[in-house]
C-alpha cells in the first residue's frame, strides 16, 4: 500500500486492481489527475503519516520535503501515529498547514507502550502519545503485576495483548531496542538474507575477473577509533600529483532485487549508537567481505583524480590491499609530531596530501560554508549509562579524509551531469528561504551579532562565525546557523548544494552504510563497464528511491536523537536537586539552558522572568522524564557576565 501511494507522486501508468476502488469512487478521486497516460497526485495534495508531539499533530510526507513539517488541522482524534492520510497543503511563511481530507490506512496494528498503575488498574500508556487515553489490556491484573514496574511492551492493538516485552523503563540497557522499536526499525535480518550474505562473504577477490590490480598501492583508511566497517581508503602520489580514492565495491556482493538488496533498501542507512551499530547489511558483509581491512585483498571502485585537472578523474573496477586501518587520533599524532610506525610511503602520502587538502579547503570555503557542528561523543559504561562526554573537533586527519571524499563525490556527480543530462541520485541542499534567513538574523541579534547593511546571507554567515570566535561563543552560534539550514536531501535531478558551495554533488563513498551510495555505484558501473544497457531502468526508479531515502534518512536521525535524549535524561536522574552552572541558549516559551559540566544536556525551565541568550545562570535539576527524554529545572541564580 505505502509503495503504491508513494508512486503516485511520480506517476503510475496503471492502477493495480486492489487499489482501483480508492481511485474510481474513493478518497483519492479528487486528488489524482491523468497526465499523458499516467496517474499523478495533483498539486497541493500530499500523502503522509502523522507524527504527534505533545497535543499537536504534524504531517510527515511520504515523498515531499517542507522547511517545517506541516501542522495538521481538523484531524479526527481516533487516528493513531503512523496512519496514512491524504491532506491538502496550504503553505504559509511560518509553517505549512495540512488540512485533513481522508484516511487511506489507519491500520496501525502494533504500538510501543509502558505499563503504569491508574485507578488501581495496570494499563498500557502509549509511548509516543502519553497524554492520550490509556489502553486496557486483556491480560489479568495478576499476570501484569508479575512484570517489572514501568515495563515497556509492544502491544497488538487488535487483540489488546502484549506481543513483545522490551524490558523495564528504568533499565538503561533497554534504550537501543526502545529507540529502534519506537521508529519501526527492523533489527534482524531474515534467514534468506543472512544465508545469501554468508555465501557472498566466502568469495575471494581473485574470483572476480577483469579488474585492475591496485594491490601495489599503499592505501590507508582513517576512521573513528571504534569503527569496524571501512568504506573508503586513500593514497596520494606526490610525483604524479594524483589522489587515489578506493571505495568498497559493495554492489558485487548485493545483487539487485535479491533479499540482501531488498532488506538493505528497507533500512536505507546503518544506525549508530555509542557502543553498537545496527547495519544496513549483515555483519558478514559490512564488517567482513566488503570492509577494507588491512592486508586483505578487497574489491573496490577506484578513482584516480589528477589534482591538476579534476575533470579528468577516472573510475575503475579494481582490487586493492589496504596497508593500515588507522584512527583519526593516530594520524593527528603523526601530523603533529612526524612520528609514526607507518611506512615511509604512507607518511609521505599523508603529509603531501595534507598540504593539498588545506589548499582545497581554503578554496572551497570561498563558496561553501564550514559548518562547525561540535559533535558530542558519548561514552557509555557496561550498565548503559553515560560515563564521559567528549566534543569531537576538526583536525588535520578529518580534513584529509573530508577533502578526499568530497573530490570523489564531485567526480561522481560530474559523471551524472555529463552522461545522464543532470539525472541520477544527487545530494542537494537548498539555500534557506528569506523567512529562514530573517529568523536567523533575529536570533543572532540576541547574541549581539548584527548584520551589516546590504551584506548578503553567505558573507554574513562567515561574518557571524568570525565574531563568535572573538566572543568565544562559536559553539552556540554554529548551533543556531545549523538549525537555520534546510536539510540536505537526495534528488533525482541535479540541484546545487548550498552548504558546500557545489553546483553538483552526490554520495559515492559510503556504500556499506548508505543505500544511496550503493544505488549510485550500480548506475555508474552500468554506464562505464556494461554498455549502459540498464541505465534507463535504473534512472526510472530514482525519483521514488530518492523519496524513500529522504524519509529513511530522517528516521535514522530520529532514532539516534531519541536514544541520546533518553541517555541525557537518565544522567539527569542521577543529579536531581543538584545545582549546575549553565548558559541560556533560547528564551521563548521555555528557557533552554545548556550545562557547562555535561555538554549536550539541555534543561527546560518555565519562568515568568525575562532572560537573554548567553546569560550565565545557576540551575537546579528538578525533573527528568524518560518517556519524552526531557530534563526540567529551575534557575536559582542569575550571574551577570556572559559565559567565556
UniProtKB/Swiss-Prot annotation:
Keywords in alphabetical order: Cytoplasm, Exonuclease, Hydrolase, Nuclease, RNA-binding
InterPro entries, alphabetized: NA-bd_OB-fold (IPR012340), RNase_II/R (IPR001900), RNase_II/R_CS (IPR022966), RNase_R (IPR011805), RNR_OB1_N (IPR054561), RNR_Ribonuclease (IPR050180)
Subcellular compartments: Cytoplasm
Domain of life of the source: Bacteria
Residue ranges occupied by any S1 motif domain in the UniProt entry: 573-644
Record GO biological process: mRNA catabolic process
EC number: 3.1.13.1
GO cellular component: a single term: cytosol
PANTHER family: DIS3-LIKE EXONUCLEASE 2 (PTHR23355:SF9), RIBONUCLEASE (PTHR23355)
Biological function: 3'-5' exoribonuclease that releases 5'-nucleoside monophosphates and is involved in maturation of structured RNAs.
Protein name: Ribonuclease R
Species, as recorded: Helicobacter pylori (strain J99 / ATCC 700824)
Amino acid at each position: 500500500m505505502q509503495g503504491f501511494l508513494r508512486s503516485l507522486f511520480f506517476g503510475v501508468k496503471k492502477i493495480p486492481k486492489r487499489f482501483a476502488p480508492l481511485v474510481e469512487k474513493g478518497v483519492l478521486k479528487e486528488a489524482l489527475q491523468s497526465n499523458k497516460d499516467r496517474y499523478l497526485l495533483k498539486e497541493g495534495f500530499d500523502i503522509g503519516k502523522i507524527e504527534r508531539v505533545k497535543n499537536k499533530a504534524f504531517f510527515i510526507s511520504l515523498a515531499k520535503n517542507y522547511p517545517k513539517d506541516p501542522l495538521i488541522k481538523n484531524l479526527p482524534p481516533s487516528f493513531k501515529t503512523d496512519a496514512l492520510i491524504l491532506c491538502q497543503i496550504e503553505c504559509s511563511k511560518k509553517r505549512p498547514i495540512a488540512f485533513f481530507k481522508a484516511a487511506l490506512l489507519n491500520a496501525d496494528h502494533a504500538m510501543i507502550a509502558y505499563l503504569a498503575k491508574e485507578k488501581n488498574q495496570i494499563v498500557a500508556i502509549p509511548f509516543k502519545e502519553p497524554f492520550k487515553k490509556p489502553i486496557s489490556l486483556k491480560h489479568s491484573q495478576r499476570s501484569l503485576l508479575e512484570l517489572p514496574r514501568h515495563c515497556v511492551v509492544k502491544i497488538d492493538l487488535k487483540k489488546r495483548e502484549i506481543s513483545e516485552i522490551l524490558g523495564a523503563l528504568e533499565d538503561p540497557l533497554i534504550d537501543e531496542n526502545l529507540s529502534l522499536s519506537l521508529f519501526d526499525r527492523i533489527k534482524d535480518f531474515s534467514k534468506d538474507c543472512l544465508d545469501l550474505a554468508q555465501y557472498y562473504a566466502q568469495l575471494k577477490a581473485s574470483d572476480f575477473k577483469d579488474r585492475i590490480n591496485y594491490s601495489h598501492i599503499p592505501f590507508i583508511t582513517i576512521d573513528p577509533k571504534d569503527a569496524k566497517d571501512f568504506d573508503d581508503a586513500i593514497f596520494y602520489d606526490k610525483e604524479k600529483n594524483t589522489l587515489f580514492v578506493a571505495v568498497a565495491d559493495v554492489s558485487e556482493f548485493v545483487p539487485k532485487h535479491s533479499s540482501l538488496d531488498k532488506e538493505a533498501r528497507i533500512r536505507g542507512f546503518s544506525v549508530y549508537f555509542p557502543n553498537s551499530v545496527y547495519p544496513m547489511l549483515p555483519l558478514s558483509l559490512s564488517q567482513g567481505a566488503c570492509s577494507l581491512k588491512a592486508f586483505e585483498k578487497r574489491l573496490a571502485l577506484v578513482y584516480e583524480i589528477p589534482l591538476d585537472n579534476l575533470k579528468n578523474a577516472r573510475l575503475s573496477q579494481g582490487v586493492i590491499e589496504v596497508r593500515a586501518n588507522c584512527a583519526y587520533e593516530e594520524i593527528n599524532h603523526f601530523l603533529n609530531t612526524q612520528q609514526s610506525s607507518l611506512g615511509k610511503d604512507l607518511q609521505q602520502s599523508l603529509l603531501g596530501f595534507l598540504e593539498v587538502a588545506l589548499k582545497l579547503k581554503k578554496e572551497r570555503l570561498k563558496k561553501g560554508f564550514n559548518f562547525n557542528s561540535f559533535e558530542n561523543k558519548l561514552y557509555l559504561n557496561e550498565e548503559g549509562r553515560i560515563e564521559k562526554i567528549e566534543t569531537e573537533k576538526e583536525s588535520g586527519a578529518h580534513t584529509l579524509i573530508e577533502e578526499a571524499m568530497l573530490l570523489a563525490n564531485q567526480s561522481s556527480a560530474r559523471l551524472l551531469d555529463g552522461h545522464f543530462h543532470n539525472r541520477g541520485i544527487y545530494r542537494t541542499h537548498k539555500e534557506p528561504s528569506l523567512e529562514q534567513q530573517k529568523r536567523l538574523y533575529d536570533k543572532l541579534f540576541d547574541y549581539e551579532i548584527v548584520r551589516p547593511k546590504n551584506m548578503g546571507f553567505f558573507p554574513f554567515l562567515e561574518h557571524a562565525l568570525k565574531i563568535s570566535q572573538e566572543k568565544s561563543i562559536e559553539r552556540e552560534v554554529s548551533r543556531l546557523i545549523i538549525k537555520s539550514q534546510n536539510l540536505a536531501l537526495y534528488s533525482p535531478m541535479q540541484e546545487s548544494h548550498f552548504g558546500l558551495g557545489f553546483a553538483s554533488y552526490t554520495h559515492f563513498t559510503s556504500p556499506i552504510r548508505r543505500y544511496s551510495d550503493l544505488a549510485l555505484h550500480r548506475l555508474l558501473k552500468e554506464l562505464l563497464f556494461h554498455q549502459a544497457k540498464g541505465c534507463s531502468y535504473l534512472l526510472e526508479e530514482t525519483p521514488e528511491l530518492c523519496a524513500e531515502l529522504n524519509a529513511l534518512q530522517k528516521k535514522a536521525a530520529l532514532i539516534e536523537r531519541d536514544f541520546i535524549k533518553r541517555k541525557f535524561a537518565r544522567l539527569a536522574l542521577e543529579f536531581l536537586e543538584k545545582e549546575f552552572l549553565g548558559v541560556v541558549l533560547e528564551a521563548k516559551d521555555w528557557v533552554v539552558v545548556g550545562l557547562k559540566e555535561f555538554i549536550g544536556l539541555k534543561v527546560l525551565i518555565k519562568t515568568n522572568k525575562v532572560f537573554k541568550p548567553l546569560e550565565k545562570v545557576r540551575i537546579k535539576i528538578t525533573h527528568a522524564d524518560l518517556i519524552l527524554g526531557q530534563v526540567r529545572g529551575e534557575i536559582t541564580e542569575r550571574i551577570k557576565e556572559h559565559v567565556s
